[in-house]
Amino acid sequence: MAKKSKQLRAALEKIDSTKAYSVEEAVALAKETNFAKFDATVEVAYNLNIDVKKADQQIRGAMVLPNGTGKTSRVLVFARGAKAEEAKAAGADFVGEDDLVAKINDGWLDFDVVIATPDMMALVGRLGRVLGPRNLMPNPKTGTVTMDVAKAVEESKGGKITYRADRAGNVQAIIGKVSFEAEKLVENFKAFNETIQKVKPATAKGTYVTNLTITTTQGVGIKVDVNSL
């Protein structure tokens, strides 16, 4: 604990809490000040000036990072017949119907992404209390309720991330690992930022991005200058 506190203090000394950095500077600092003994995740956190109580200001979606996330997702697909075979051919880790529902209800959760064809949603709906709180419930907005299961599986395996604004307008997302080259992290960030800008609600007023930070697992939040984007 003492060693970790010392490392945290050392990291804090390198970061000026009164300054907002460029994306390139923030990424470099995030890599430099990371003291985790594992390949830490690099995350971005936005605070958006939106009112999610209004239906037209709710933000939710998915996108594929150009350089991936550095993590191989375990993909589960609810499908039958030809679509089940399509999912298997695309590399899905688990494919099934009622058998998977029973397994999940028994406590099995060794997967990261759930995809379903539309006709399977009545079945998947039985798992709402299990999948919903874990943000695993398939949803058309994130491309996880689809007939194109091959594409959905390939994207999930290839760096697809989902995002959603919480009640306070906060949006968090993974943009890679500390082991990534800085340029690749910057590219991933810029791709995600472009997505966030594109989904800005037409009815949102004032400054859209009010705060933005980049951090690593167990690391220190580094403020990004939103005016530099």
Swiss-Prot record:
GO terms for cellular component: large ribosomal subunit. Belongs to the universal ribosomal protein uL1 family. It comes from Streptococcus pneumoniae (strain CGSP14). This is Large ribosomal subunit protein uL1. Keywords: Repressor, Ribonucleoprotein, Ribosomal protein, RNA-binding, rRNA-binding, Translation regulation, tRNA-binding. It comes from the Bacteria. One of its GO terms (molecular function) is rRNA binding. Part of the 50S ribosomal subunit. Binds directly to 23S rRNA. The L1 stalk is quite mobile in the ribosome, and is involved in E site tRNA release. Protein L1 is also a translational repressor protein, it controls the translation of the L11 operon by binding to its mRNA. GO terms for biological process: regulation of translation; translation.
